[in-house]
């Protein structure tokens, strides 16, 4: 993933959390044979992930999902 794409995706996650008044209180990095991503959680529930592969920059879950 290019650095600019990474920063734009990270900003999108942060902006959506701010808009919806969601506090991201945990960030985990997953890197194994299947996942290469950064997961963002609020109160123990995953609300977004930032995919570090070519498949797509980010996904939203739960309270951050449309």
Placement of each model-derived feature along the sequence:
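N-terminal acidic leader/helix
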Residues: 1-27
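Detector for the mature cores of small, proteolytically processed
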Residues: 29-66
């Amino acid at each position: 993933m290019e650095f600019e794409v990474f920063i734009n995706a990270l900003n999108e996650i942060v902006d959506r959390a701010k808009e919806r008044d969601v506090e991201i209180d945990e960030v985990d990095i997953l890197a194994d044979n299947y996942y290469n991503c950064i997961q963002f959680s609020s109160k123990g529930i995953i609300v977004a992930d930032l995919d570090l592969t070519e498949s797509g920059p980010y996904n939203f879950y739960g309270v951050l999902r449309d």
